Amino acid sequence: MTILSLSRFMLAGVLLASFNASAIPGFWQQGYGQGNTEYSVTEASGKTFTINCTGNPDQNGFYQHSVFLTLADDKMVSSHDDDTTITVVMDHQQYIIPSSLGWRNGDNAWFDFISNISEAGQFDVYVNDHKAGTFTADRKNAEKVLSTLGDCSND
């Protein structure tokens, strides 16, 4: 893990702690800070799923968007973590979150994921093929909060 991605990881943790402490389960929230827009939803046991959309390109000009999963014990895993694969299953289809963007298959997988997450009333998150949580989201809330998620691409 590079210093830059570690810094982003720490920033995400601080942002999550600040606005998810009082999150109502099943409702998406949006937060912004340091050039990152984050969309988070919490489930009843306290696990939080976050989509991180960075406005700061890497040294190659690519936006390295990611997802984070904060577990009930405040342990956090990221799609950027080495040896970590995060898969989201919604509407009977799996979306493997790429560890980096800026390559065709990764960009396509990311686009498919962000194009469909706002329609999901429920989705499961797997970390390294082990189910880590089930999130139920209010659809009307998702339509409103995730309406700008299309900006979270590498186009």
Curated annotation (Swiss-Prot):
Organism: Escherichia coli (strain K12)
Stretch forming the signal peptide: 1-23
Classification lineage: Bacteria, Pseudomonadati, Pseudomonadota, Gammaproteobacteria, Enterobacterales
Name the UniProt record assigns to this protein: Uncharacterized protein YkfB
Family per similarity comment: To E.coli YfjT.
Keywords: Signal
Domain of life, per lineage: Bacteria
Encoding gene (name): ykfB
